[in-house]
Amino acid sequence: MNVADETLIKWANTHLPDNLQITDPTGPLCGGLGLLRLAESIKGRPSSPPVPDSAFPTDPNDDKLDGLFRLFDFLLDNDVKMGSVSINDVRQGKRDKILQLLRALKAWEDKRRALANTIARGSIPTNAGFMLPVVIS
């Protein structure tokens, strides 16, 4: 495991509830439930309607897929750039794909913070007393 991945896992744990913390950085990372709770934490509110923990598979052979579909809907609806990660990748706990999603969620959080900072700066008057325009693309 490299330093960047360790840093990413520490970051993820700041968003995850105690029962979903990643405790062994070399073992399984997190499943769909952890990824959804992480995304909800970044957004600052739960998905609507709420997704119960029981909607997620507990192992790769579990057929509960509703939670995973809701996770991917949430990520797509919020424009999280997931790349080539599939529901099956998450269901099977593929480490490289979970890390890819964690990176995507971190990038999404960074983008949200940058946008919030831009909006905040746009409301501060300049020396001439004019308001700075805010352009959101």
Task: Pin down the residues of each PLM region.
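Alpha-helical coiled-coil scaffolding segments
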Residues: 1-137
